[in-house]
Structure formats: structure tokens, C-alpha cells
Amino acid sequence: MIKALFFDVDGTLVSFNTHKIPESTIKALQMAHDKGVKIFTATGRPLQLLNNIPEVQHLMDGYILATGALCIYGDTTVREDFIPHNEVMAFVDYCSKNNIPTVFVGKKDIQIYNRNEMVNHVLYDMLKVTYNKYDVPLEEVIDQGILQITSFITDEQEKDILPQLPGCTSARWYPSFTDITSATADKANGIRAIAKHLGIDISETMAFGDGGNDKSMLMAAGIGVAMGNAVDDVKAHANYVTTSVDEDGIKNALMHFGVI
């Protein structure tokens, strides 16, 4: 029996085409919630940038954020996983030398380093981010502990810098940037932490995703569902492929497995 659902946000809950949550998804989550199933996001976004799910915010029991680096259930922080400080500083140096725009996500605040128009376009035009409070200096954000680095680097630059960050891993869910986290921070470990906190078995969880940073949780969950709009590599890591986010994919999968 499925007792907890975990949803990626962009491309899974929220359509990249409409930038909205389909009505069928809202109704499906409400039905699952009414049956006592716990509902969580599992997203690369930090909490400050999670502004695109207002229609279902009231249904969320908790959040897996920053690709698993921060896990919250209710008001309880279940898991925090920070990037090693020396590797954060090494990446700052790399960004400085190569003029790379990068978002540093601290425990409390966010700062954008080398901000440019491309960053503004992706965050505010493409991903519809509304957060714009970047008044805390980067040094202070780093001192809080860095949960995630979202860097607008090319694939080649990513391959160049990652060997210098042995305590980190990366995952790309949008072409323009990659999310860098602690090597032990991923959505799968986030689900494991939440399941342990809830006192349920991992086999009683179900995860939905479409992007590269979803593969680990699709394999870890009791049932891993890839959206129809996912790339083939993600689909290959899932137990089941549903229809796309715009074609009632979440509702269809929840009905298929008898969750609703």
C-alpha cells in the first residue's frame, strides 16, 4: 500500500508549456490527501524559489528541496546535507576566473554570483521565479552552509570542475544549468530520510519525475513513475511510464496503481 507520494515540480507537477499545475493533477492530489496519503515535493528548487505550486501548497506534508540536501516534514527539519566548505570556496574561485553565473543556496539565504541577463531570463522568464531578495553578501551566505550550487556552466565546464570537487555530485534538470550538491545529497536519500522519519518502508513510497535529477528517486521508491514528457534515459530508470504532465499523467498513474 502506498503511504507517501513524492513529486518533482518542474515538468512533473508543473507543465513547462503552461507553467501551471493541470486541474487533473490538483484533483488527484486532493483525492490522495483525503485518503490519508502523505504528499511531498522532491525538487531541485530551494524553498525560497518554490513559488510555482500555490494550487497544491496546502496539500503538502513536507518537502525534499535542493535535490535532497534539505528535507522537511511539517515544521521539522529531517535532513540537512551541506557541501564541504573547501569545495564551495574552490567553486567560487572557478566561477571568478571563468566569469560563470552561479546561484549559491545557503541555509537561510541565496546569492547570485556574476549575475547576468541570461540568469534573469532563465529564472524569471522561463522558470517564473518570483524571489528577488539577494541582499545578503555571498560571504555570509557561505558561512551559513551551502546546500546547493546552481551554476550556469556548460557540459564541458562541468566535466572540468567536478573532479576537483570529490565531495560533490551534479544533476542537470534544465539545459542552462546544473545543480551541484553534496555527494550524499540526492532525491533518493531524501525519500529514504522522510520514509524513516514517518516510520514507513521505502516500498510504501511512490515517486514521479521527468528530469535527470529524478533518476535516483525513481529507482529508490517502491514505485518510480516517469512522466511521458521525460527523456528516454529517465524513463529507463522507472517502473512505469505514464502520460505527459499535460495529458493527465499524474492522475492516470495514481489511478493505474489504485492510489486514488
Please tell me what each predicted stretch does.
Residues K3-T18:
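Asp-based phosphoryl-transfer active-site loop
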Residues V56-L59, A66-T67, Q164-G167, A220-A221, ...:
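Short, structured coil segments at secondary-structure junctions
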Residues G36-F40, L59, G145-I149, S203-T205, ...:
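Short active-site oxyanion
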Residues Y94, N98-F208, G212-M217, N229:
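Conserved acidic, metal-coordinating active-site core of Asp-based
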Residues M60-A66, D81, Y124, S170-Y174, ...:
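Short hydrophobic/aromatic-enriched beta-strand-loop microsegments
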Residues M1-A4, P22, I180-I260:
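Mg2+-dependent phosphoryl-transfer enzymes with acidic/Ser/Thr/Gly-rich catalytic loops
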Residues Q57-M60, E80-I83, V119-Y124, N189, ...:
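Short, hinge-like loop/turn segments at secondary-structure boundaries
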Residues E23-M118:
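Active-site phosphate-binding/coordination module
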